[in-house]
């Protein structure tokens, strides 16, 4: 007997955060309504990596998806949509931000690494263009390793301008 998965009840309290990051793998813990509630109440930027097909379109919200997830979206009219394109880099507002060409050993965790560097870049520079390139550089470092890779301090120095 499997227990029915219940949606995660998260109190919305984002006032003291520099950013909110939502990684939602659409397993039923985080409802679409809760994501919208978090975005609506946030006084800081919200970064979402989600498998859901309905996503918020708000000025303070950045949505990161990959090519496959892009094809499944219900609404393509999202202002701050970031589409990761593997070795090509990412697209934001119809502009390609190219990635450095590297030898790829393992892509596991590359999207999470991209998102972490993107968020770090944005909260430290408030510049989305620089942040996207930081995300690309971080993911390029991660895919050169076997398995899930956590950036070192030396790696972080490499991704900074």
PLM features: residue spans?
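Conserved phosphate-binding/catalytic region of the ribokinase-like
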Residues: 13-19, 33-59, 72-161
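A short beta-strand/loop micro-motif in the catalytic core of glycosyltransferases
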Residues: 61-67
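Conserved phosphate-binding/catalytic loop of the ribokinase/pfkB sugar-kinase fold
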Residues: 1-17
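Short acidic, glycine-rich surface-loop motifs adjacent to enzyme active sites
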Residues: 17-29
């Amino acid at each position: 007997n499997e227990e029915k998965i219940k949606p995660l009840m998260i109190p919305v309290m984002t006032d003291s955060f520099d950013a909110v990051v939502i990684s939602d793998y659409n397993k039923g813990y985080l409802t679409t309504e809760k994501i919208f509630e978090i975005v609506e109440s946030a006084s800081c930027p919200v970064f979402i990596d989600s498998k859901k097909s309905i996503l918020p379109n708000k000025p303070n919200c950045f949505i990161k998806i990959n090519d496959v997830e892009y094809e499944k979206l219900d609404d393509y009219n999202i202002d701050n949509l970031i589409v990761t394109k593997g070795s090509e880099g990412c697209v934001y507002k119809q502009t390609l931000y190219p990635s450095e060409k590297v030898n790829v050993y393992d892509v596991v965790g590359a999207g999470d690494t991209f998102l972490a560097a993107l968020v770090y870049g944005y909260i430290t520079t408030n510049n989305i263009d620089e942040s996207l390139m930081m995300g690309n550089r971080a993911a390029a470092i991660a895919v050169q390793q076997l398995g899930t890779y956590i950036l070192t301090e030396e790696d972080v120095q490499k991704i900074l301008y």
